[in-house]
UniProtKB/Swiss-Prot annotation:
Monomer. The active site is at E199. It catalyses: Endohydrolysis of the N-glycosidic bond at one specific adenosine on the 28S rRNA. Residues 1-24 form the signal peptide. Disulfide bonds join C58-C282, C108-C130. GO terms for cellular component: extracellular region. Inhibits viral infection of plants, and protein synthesis in vitro. Has also been shown to inhibit the replication of mammalian viruses. The protein may provide a means of cellular suicide upon invasion by a virus. SUPFAM superfamilies: Ribosome inactivating proteins (RIP) (SSF56371). GO terms for molecular function: rRNA N-glycosylase activity; toxin activity. One of its GO terms (biological process) is negative regulation of translation. It comes from Phytolacca americana. This is Antiviral protein alpha.
Length: 294
């Protein structure tokens, strides 16, 4: 009996001391160098499955969890055609990229965005990306993770930054293991990676843009850019809809930049992959045959 008590105490101590960031994080790997449309689709599905809260859904669209659900983070490893890898760390509740890791001189090198470095989550990023304290080294990202901050470092708006599998593949090699690279090079890689990973997971429309233009570089159109900036209000509008009708019209943009007025969930449902967490109950399904696939 005494031995059992000791074992229980040891297990509880381990659980208390073990950093929450290490709980059940599975790394999702995407082989960018050998990518196909089907492999990219599978990659997106893996992110959806690991990120979503399995108990939350509005009108058939899965929702991300609140900040209390563990694991709190996702790791996404991107591998180029030369087998070089960069691992992105994403917050599970919103898919924001917090930082990334590569290998430098045989050690795990972690990079943390400036706006994350000033928070209590900094240690989570460091220990999750590079768990071994004796084999890690840090290299700061001296700017924030917002689009305006990234665009400022790149020197042009993201509407003028090409996306595409080959662009993503080549970007990995410009960072991995490199002693010194410019902030412009880093920010351009991150702009591409964030849109092709996080934004594509949030929006089926962006995922489909990548698949449609799979073998060529492309510029994000006005609809892509607008969706990226409207995820929160889109999620709230869908969450608050009454039997498919939005409580107020949602003004968005079409691909050509013209005005797109959304009145019903089914107008935008095909474009959405994941909803941002919104507190409170919502209709899990449409109370008609509008969504036969559910």
């Amino acid at each position: 009996m005494k031995m059992m008590v000791v074992v229980v105490v040891m297990m509880l101590s381990w659980l208390i001391l073990k950093p929450p960031s290490t709980w059940a994080i599975n790394t999702i790997t995407f082989d960018v160098g050998n990518a196909t449309i089907n492999k990219y689709a599978t990659f997106m599905k893996s992110i959806h499955n690991q990120a979503k809260d399995p108990t939350l859904k509005c009108y058939g669209i899965p929702m991300l969890p609140n900040t209390n659900l563990t694991p709190k983070y996702l790791l996404v490893t991107l591998q180029d055609s030369s087998l070089k890898t960069i691992t992105l760390m994403l917050k599970r509740n919103n898919l924001y990229v917090m930082g990334y890791a590569d290998t430098y001189n045989g050690k795990c090198r972690y990079h943390i965005f400036k706006d994350i470095s000033n928070t209590t989550e900094r240690n989570d990023v460091m220990t999750t990306l590079c768990p071994n304290p004796s084999s890690r080294v840090g290299k700061n990202i001296n700017y924030d993770s917002s689009y305006p901050a990234l665009e400022k470092k790149v020197g042009r708006p993201r509407s003028q930054v090409q996306l595409g599998i080959q662009i993503l593949n080549s970007g990995i090699g410009k960072i991995y293991g490199v002693d010194s690279f410019t902030e412009k090079t880093e920010a351009e890689f991150l702009l591409v990676a964030i849109q092709m990973v996080s934004e594509a997971a949030r929006f089926k429309y962006i995922e489909n843009q990548v698949k449609t233009n799979f073998n060529r570089a492309f510029y994000p159109n006005a609809k892509v850019l607008n969706l990226e900036e409207s995820w929160g209000k889109i999620s709230t509008a869908i969450h608050n809809a009454k039997n498919g009708a939005l409580t107020s019209p949602l003004e968005l943009k079409n691909a050509n930049g013209s005005k797109w007025i959304v009145l019903r969930v089914d107008d935008i449902e095909p474009d959405v992959g994941l909803l941002k967490y919104v507190n409170g109950t919502c209709q899990a399904t449409y109370q008609s045959a509008m969504f036969p696939h559910l």
